[in-house]
């Protein structure tokens, strides 16, 4: 039995007057479903950093060493490396609704196991399951956004989704220790993380209903599994791509493995309190905690994420207009070095260094990820992004473990901060090599929209001659 012919897609400009305000072809419907698509990963972002946010309490109450905290992040990345090879294929096989629900449930199961765990192995098992679901869910979320916003407000939609997702991380760092102290148990805080994951599952059900309705009314594009690795494409990548990949590994390895134990470092080295002292109910204390974000250890850690939430969409728009992607990656890698060294070898207030890291975390990803389609052929972008994500997770798996082991071995965070500064040096080298390679390949990364448009017009004129 053949499928019925797809109905023509109704755009806002061609929609008949009889179509209602909340019709799937209308902007209000798209942005409402975008809200629920964005909330699919809110729980996973919250739960991912709940371990780092609670690190001092977990170390004290469970008698864990720092390397165990790092290992919990490593377990997540191991699952992420494996699942990146299958996530896109599962999406193609199951479709957007069933795939997103499956991965949301995996995230919930993993977070629940972590919250209920009574041994280290149960903690590791929970993080493995959580990582498998979370990384796949991020891939699926990107594919779903592309499905609904292709040819429309794509860049805006991705910016909104990232900002809403990062709210989970911001809340995790600024509420988890408070929840643990308020209820007298770290386990309640871990259950709060699982509750956020349950909330994402409920949002998934709303998304499923809206997507099903939209699919019945509109001829939505055929689901695309997103970033899938085709091994035959790998040998076709030029040097610029590989420098972007190496820069990606070194840069992210100097950020996320650092934040895994940054809360413990600020509390351990500077004696910065874990929560802001206040009275009243939990909500009242949480508001005070957010107001004094720069004066608590978890709040300082979240400065990087807060900067990304607020400024990343503007940075993306700016870079689209001016170009200079390789140059900005040089600058972003450069500032990592003094920021980490100052926190490692001095007792200066760490807030300025964290603000610098936040600025780097705004600039470099905004320049890095859009560079991939500029240095590889369009048909190989999926392989390029999938491979880059897999290699990135190698660093995100290795360096949290090294961070914890160095702290356990030396008794201070000086060696770990020097390690992160060295990653900044390596990233700076790769950024300069990328800049040189890009110049040899036409300087596409340095071009802004106006220059790209001008070159496109020249090429079109030459083709007509």
Label every model-predicted segment:
Residues 126-164:
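Cytoplasmic helix-loop-helix junction between adjacent transmembrane helices
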């Amino acid at each position: 039995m053949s499928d019925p012919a797809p109905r023509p897609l109704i755009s806002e400009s061609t929609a008949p007057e009889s179509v209602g305000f909340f019709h799937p072809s209308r902007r209000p419907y798209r942005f409402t479903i975008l809200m629920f698509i964005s909330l699919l990963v809110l729980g996973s972002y919250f739960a991912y950093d709940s371990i780092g946010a609670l690190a001092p309490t977990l170390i004290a109450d469970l008698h864990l060493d720092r390397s165990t905290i790092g290992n919990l992040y490593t377990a997540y990345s191991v699952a992420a490396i494996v699942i990146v090879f299958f996530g896109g294929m599962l999406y193609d096989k199951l479709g957007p609704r069933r795939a997103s629900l499956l991965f949301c449930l995996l995230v919930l199961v993993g977070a629940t196991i972590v919250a209920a765990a009574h041994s280290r192995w149960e903690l590791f098992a929970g993080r493995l399951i959580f990582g498998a679901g979370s990384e796949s869910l991020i891939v699926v979320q990107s594919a779903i956004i592309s499905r609904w916003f292709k040819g429309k407000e794509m860049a805006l939609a991705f910016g909104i989704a990232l900002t809403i997702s990062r709210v989970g991380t911001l809340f995790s760092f600024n509420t988890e220790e408070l929840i643990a102290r308020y209820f007298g148990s770290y386990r309640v805080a871990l259950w709060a993380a699982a509750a956020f994951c349950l909330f994402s599952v409920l949002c998934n059900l709303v998304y499923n209903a809206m997507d099903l309705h939209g699919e019945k009314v509109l001829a939505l594009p055929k689901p695309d599994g997103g970033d899938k690795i085709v091994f035959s494409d790998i040998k076709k990548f030029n040097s610029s791509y590989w420098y972007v990949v190496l820069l990606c590994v070194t840069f992210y390895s100097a950020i996320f493995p650092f934040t895994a134990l940054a809360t413990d470092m600020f509390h351990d080295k500077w004696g910065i309190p874990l929560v802001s002292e206040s009275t009243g109910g939990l909500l009242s204390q949480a508001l005070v905690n957010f107001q004094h974000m720069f004066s608590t250890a978890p709040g300082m850690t979240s400065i990087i994420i807060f900067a990304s939430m607020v400024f990343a969409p503007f940075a993306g728009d700016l870079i689209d207009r001016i170009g200079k992607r390789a140059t900005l990656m040089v600058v972003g890698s450069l500032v990592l070095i003094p920021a980490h060294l100052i926190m490692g070898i001095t007792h200066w207030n760490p807030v300025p260094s964290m603000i610098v890291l936040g600025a780097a975390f705004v600039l470099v990803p905004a320049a890095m990820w859009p560079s991939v389609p500029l240095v590889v052929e369009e048909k190989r972008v999926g392989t390029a992004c999938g491979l880059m994500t897999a290699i990135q997770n190698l660093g995100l798996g290795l360096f949290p473990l090294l961070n914890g082991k160095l702290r356990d071995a030396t008794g201070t965070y000086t060696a770990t901060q020097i390690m992160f500064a060295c990653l900044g040096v390596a990233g700076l080298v790769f950024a300069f090599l990328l800049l040189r390679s890009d110049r040899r390949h036409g300087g596409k990364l340095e071009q802004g929209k106006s220059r790209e448009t001008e070159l496109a017009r020249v090429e079109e004129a030459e083709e007509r001659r």
